[in-house]
A protein has these predicted regions:
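All-alpha prenyltransferase/terpene-synthase fold signal
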Residues: 1-278
Length: 278
C-alpha cells in the first residue's frame, strides 16, 4: 500500500537521522521521541503531495523529515503543558529528562525543522505561516480550558489551526517540491485541512474512549485536564438536567475529577456517536 511504502521510507530516514545526532543531553530526547513507533501521517502527506503532481518521494524526503521534526517538537511541548505522563505508550520526555531539558530539546528540534525545510524559499514561507498558526491553535486550546462558554464553531476553528493547517502544509509543501501551480497547491491544501478536522475529531474520541494499550495515552486525559474537546462541548450543550454534573466535575482539580463518571455521561448523551458520524 502507498502509506506503508511512505512509512517505510520515512522510518528509514528517521533512523539514519537519529543515528547521526550527537550523544548528549540536548539531542537524546530528540532521538527518543522521533524513534518511538508512530504513524508518520504528516511526513507521508509531504511525499504523497509530491508524487500526486509528478514528483519523486525521495526528492521530498528532507521536507518530510522537517515536518515530522516540527510535529514532534509540538508534541514535546504539548506534553509539558498538559502534564501528560505517556506518549505512544512510553514516558513523555519531561517525565524522563525533566521539564527544562524537554523545553530546550524541543526548541532545538524546531531549529532543525527549519534547517530541513530550507531548500526552497516558498516552502520556508509556507512553513513559517503554518508554524505560527499551530501556536495560535495551541493557545486557543489552553484559553478554552479557562472558559465555560466555548461553542462548537470556536472549537472547529481551534482544531483547524492546531491540526488542520499542518496537514494542509504537508500536502502543499509536497506539491511545491513537485512544481505544482498555485491553484493545485490551494486545492490539495484545502483537502488537508478537512482531513485534519476529521483526524482531530477521531483523536478526541480515542483519547476519551480508546484502549490505553492501543493508543499509548492515558484514557480520558483530555477530560481530566478540562480540555474543551468536541465531546465535552456538545455534552455541556446537551446535558440539560445533567449539566451540573459535568460542571461540578470540571470545577474540581484535575486529579480529583471522576473521569469514568464524566465519560459515562458523555457516552450516554450520544456525543461519541455524533463525533464519529461527522
Amino acid at each position: 500500500m502507498m502509506m506503508e511504502r511512505y512509512t517505510g521510507l520515512i522510518d528509514a530516514r528517521v533512523t539514519a537521522w537519529c543515528g547521526a545526532l550527537p550523544d548528549n543531553a540536548l539531542h537524546a530526547p530528540m532521538a527518543y521521541l522521533m524513534g518511538l513507533p508512530a504513524k508518520r501521517v504528516r511526513p507521508a502527506l509531504v511525499l504523497m503531495g509530491c508524487e500526486l503532481f509528478g514528483g519523486s518521494a525521495e526528492h521530498a524526503m528532507d521536507e518530510a523529515i522537517g515536518i515530522e521534526l516540527f510535529h514532534n517538537f509540538t508534541l514535546m511541548h504539548d506534553d509539558i503543558m498538559d502534564k501528560a505522563p505517556l506518549r505512544r505508550g512510553r514516558p513523555t520526555v519531561h517525565e524522563k529528562w525533566g521539564v527544562n531539558t524537554a523545553i530546550l530539546s524541543g526548541d532545538a528540534m524546531m531549529v532543525k525543522a527549519y534547517q530541513a525545510l530550507g531548500r526552497y524559499p516558498e516552502v520556508h514561507a509556507v512553513f513559517s505561516r503554518c508554524a505560527l498558526e499551530v501556536c495560535e491553535g495551541q493557545q486557543l486550546d489552553m484559553d478554552f480550558e479557562r472558559r465555560a462558554d466555548v461553542g462548537v464553531d470556536e472549537y472547529m476553528e481551534m482544531i483547524r489551526l492546531k491540526t488542520g493547517v499542518l496537514l494542509a502544509c504537508a500536502l502543499r509543501i509536497g506539491s511545491i517540491v513537485a512544481g505544482a501551480g498555485p491553484e493545485d497547491q490551494d486545492r490539495i491544501a484545502a483537502f488537508g485541512e478537512h482531513l485534519g478536522l476529521a483526524f482531530q475529531l477521531r483523536d478526541d474520541v480515542l483519547d476519551a474512549f480508546g484502549d490505553t494499550a492501543k493508543t499509548g495515552k492515558q484514557q480520558g486525559g483530555d477530560v481530566r485536564a478540562g480540555k474543551k474537546t468536541f465531546l465535552l462541548i456538545r455534552g455541556l450543550e446537551r446535558a440539560a438536567e445533567n449539566r451540573g454534573i459535568l460542571r461540578d466535575e470540571l470545577a474540581k482539580s484535575p486529579d480529583a475529577r471522576d473521569v469514568p463518571r464524566m465519560l459515562g455521561l458523555l457516552e450516554a448523551l450520544g456525543v461519541r456517536d455524533e463525533a464519529e458520524a461527522l
